[in-house]
Amino acid sequence: MKSIIFNEIKKILECDFALENPKDKNLAHFATPLAFSLAKELKKSPMLIASDLASKFQNHDCFELVEAVNGYLNFRISKTFLNELANQALTNPNDFTKGEKKQESFLLEYVSANPTGPLHIGHARGAVFGDTLTRLARHLGYKFDTEYYVNDAGNQIYLLGLSILLSVKENILHENVEYPEQYYKGEYIADLAKEAFEKFGKEFFSEENIPSLADWAKDKMLVLIKQNLEQVKIKIDSYVSERSYYDALNATLESLKEHKGIYEQEGKIWLASSQKGDEKDRVIIREDGRGTYLAADIVYHKDKMSRGYGKCINIWGADHHGYIPRMKAAMEFLGFDSNNLEIILAQMVSLLKDGEPYKMSKRAGNFILMSDVVDEIGSDALRYIFLSKKCDTHLEFDISDLQKEDSSNPVYYINYAHARIHQVFAKAGKKIDDVMKADLQSLNQDGVNLLFEALNLKAVLNDAFEARALQKIPDYLKNLAANFHKFYNENKVVGSANENDLLKLFSLVALSIKTAFSLMGIEAKNKMEH
C-alpha cells in the first residue's frame, strides 16, 4: 500500500520526497516533511508551502483528508480506496503482499554446523532466522538460494571418530582408556558406538580406522541434522562439502599470490589481511603444508562469489565476529567487491524454565538440544521467540511463558485473534464471499485505522527484509492482535447494523495474521485447542 500511495502523491507533487508513517493514525496515515526541504529554495515558510501543496489534492479518490500541520503534509486514506485494496487482497489471498519478480539474486549460507552431533539451541536461532529470511525474500520476488557448508575435513571430524572409538573400548570392550582434552561426549556418542560395534565388529576398532569411523558417523549426524531442521520446517536447497574444494586450493593460492594477498614467513603462508583492515595477518598454510580452516573457507567463498549472485549472505554465530575482516580481506585480494559478502551474526541464547536455567541435555553432554525444546513448546513457539528480537542481540526467554494460554504468550495471543475472527464468522453464519460487497463506509475511525494496519503488512515486510530486521514482523503482529482485541471488545459485531463491514474488516486482519505467520514458518490456528 505504501508504494501505491507514494506513486499517487508523486504524480501530483512531481518531485522526490520522504513518506513517513506517523504513530498517531487519527492524525494521519502518511506524512511528508517535503515543505521543510523546499523552504530555502522557495524562500517561504514550511507551513505556507505545505498549505499550497495540500490544495493540489482536492477531491483525490485516494485521500479522505490532506492537510498541512506544522509544516508537514498529512494524508488520511479514504475508506473507498482502502475498500479497493481490501477487495484485491480478499479476491487473491495467496498473492496478498507478494512482490513482483525481481532481478536481484542472493545466496544464503546458514546453519553449517559441524556434522559432529545434533543441533543445539545456539544453532537454532540462525537456522530459524535464515529460513524466515528465505521465505520472506522469495515472497517479495527475489531469487534466493540456500546452502549448508559441511565441515567434513577438519580435526573436528577426526575427533568424532576418536570419541566413538574410545567409547567402544571403554563401554563395550571394557578397556582402560585415556580421553584427550577435547572429545565428544553424551548419550549420542554411546549410541553411535553401540551401532558402529554392531555394524563393523570388534576387529575394526583400531586407530588406523578412525578416519573411516569418522566418515560413517559424520554421515549419520548429517541425516540427524536434516531431521532436526525438518522438525522446525526448514529445508535447505543444497549441502556442499568442504572436501570438494581441496583441489581448488592451489589455484586460489596462486590468485592470492598474484594480487599480493599472501606471503611466506617462518615456513608458513600468511594472508596479508592487515592491509585490508584486519587487526593482524592470518596463517592459511601451516609449516607442515596443511591448510588451516581459513584456507578452505576462502576457497569456498571464492567459489560462492564467482557464481553470479548479486549478494552472498552468511549467518554466523556471534563468536565468529573477528572472522569477518579476514574473509572480506581475502575476497578483496581475489578481486571481488567485499560489500557483496554480507555477514549476519546470531547472538547467544539463554534459556530458562520456570525462572531457572534450562538443564543441559544428557544426550548431547553440555548443550541444550534444539529437538528437546521443540518437544516441549513446539516448532511455532520456538520460531516466534527466535524472531522476536534482532538477531545480533542477546536473547533470553523462559519457555514456561510459551506454554501459557494468555496474553503473556505472544503466539497464543496472536493466534487467539485469528481464531476469534473465525469464531465470529461462524457465529454470524457467514463466509468471506457473503461480505465482499460491503463498502466499509460505516467503519468508525478505530475501524479505519485497524484496516489500514492490516493492509500495511507489505510495507512492514519490505522494511524487515531490507534492514534484515525480521523482528519487525512479530512486532507488527503483536500490535495488530492487540488493536484487534481492543476493537472487538469495544464494538458489537454479530447482529449490528454494520455487521458485514466489520466482518470484512476482520477478514483482512485474519489474512494479515495468516500471511505474516506463514512467512515466519508458523501455522495460524482457526480454533484454539486447550
UniProtKB/Swiss-Prot annotation:
Gene Ontology molecular function: any one: ATP binding
GO cellular component, one term: cytoplasm
Record SMART domains: Arg_tRNA_synt_N, DALR_1
Keywords for this protein: Aminoacyl-tRNA synthetase, ATP-binding, Cytoplasm, Ligase, Nucleotide-binding, Protein biosynthesis
GO terms, biological process: arginyl-tRNA aminoacylation
EC number: 6.1.1.19
Known partners and oligomeric status: Monomer.
Protein name: Arginine--tRNA ligase
Originating organism: Campylobacter jejuni subsp. jejuni serotype O:23/36 (strain 81-176)
The organism's taxonomic lineage, starting at the top: Bacteria, Pseudomonadati, Campylobacterota, Epsilonproteobacteria, Campylobacterales
